Design a protein with these regions (language model features):
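Conserved C-terminal "switch" segment of AAA+ ATPases
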Residues: 1-49, 135-143, 170-179
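Signal for well-folded cores of large energy- and translation-related assemblies
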Residues: 3, 18, 30, 34, ...
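A short, mixed-charge helix-start or loop-turn motif at secondary-structure junctions
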Residues: 14-16, 67, 187
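A general structural motif at alpha-helix termini
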Residues: 14-17, 29, 54, 103, ...
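Conserved catalytic-core segments of large NTP-driven translation/proteostasis enzymes
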Residues: 36, 43-88
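Soluble catalytic regions of large protease machineries
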Residues: 73-77, 84-239
């Protein structure tokens, strides 16, 4: 039995772990959270110990950069805030489990982690479009609020391309679906249908970021202050 604070929210832990395997959850609770408590000279586990232990299982150990250039840190914060704002408004059926600008052992400088609140066995194509918007939002937020594009969005753009291919094989762009099923890599991004929708989504994202600029700025400042935000802390800013 693990000594723990009585205020631990089991429902929140369950809500934040649909992506985690039972082995990951067990390791996070029985080993990693206890290690964190011992390092803090405590004989009991707090909610934050479990939350951070689960994040370690999902995205890697925290490996913060002590002397990161403040401008670069702000860029990362704007990037993750952009993801979070668009996620909040475009994918309201998902829960933002965590937003962080703490570098992880996986190499990522920051992340926004959404999780499904119900089991998904099928979905409307608009959810795929929503995921594309979320993927593109970080890079666009940096441009909108810092005046220029930065590096750091390679993974996001790979995700967007993958989701566009996902749309294609489900008939979003019309024919020739059969050819795409044989080799989805043949989807050409010079295709006018794809380019038109891609540009349209970018324009829509930029409008939303400007419309919610106060929330972007507030979330960015909160990230710079705390570095790592839980679902509750994100919603304190976004409502």
């Amino acid at each position: 039995k693990i000594n723990h604070d009585e205020s631990i929210d089991v429902d929140a832990i369950v809500a934040d772990t649909p992506r985690a395997t039972p082995a990951q959850v067990m390791s996070a609770i029985t080993k990693d959270s206890v290690r964190r408590a011992l390092f803090a000279n405590r004989e009991y586990v707090l909610q934050e110990d479990i939350d951070q232990a689960i994040q370690e299982q999902l995205v890697g150990m925290a490996n913060p950069i002590e002397d990161m250039d403040p401008v670069l840190l702000r860029q990362v914060a704007y990037h993750e805030s952009g993801h979070a704002i668009i996620q909040h408004y475009v994918m309201p059926d998902q829960r933002i489990s965590r937003v962080s600008i703490v570098r992880r052992s996986s190499g990522t400088l920051g992340y926004m982690l959404p999780v499904d609140t119900v089991e998904m066995y099928g979905q409307p194509l608009r959810r795929i479009v929503g995921r594309i918007m979320v993927a593109l939002a970080g890079h666009l937020a940096v441009k909108v609020f810092m005046g220029e594009f930065w590096t750091g969005a390679t993974g996001d753009y790979n995700m967007a391309r993958m989701e566009f291919r996902n749309l294609a094989v489900h008939g979003f762009f019309g024919p020739p679906v059969s050819e795409l099923y044989r080799d989805v890599k043949e989807l050409q991004f010079s295709d006018e249908r794809v380019e038109r929708i891609w540009v349209s989504l970018e324009e829509q994202i930029e409008r939303m970021l400007v419309e919610h600029a106060d929330e972007v700025e507030a979330l960015t400042e909160r990230l710079l202050e705390r570095r790592d935000l839980s679902n509750k802390e994100v919603l304190e800013v976004l409502g």
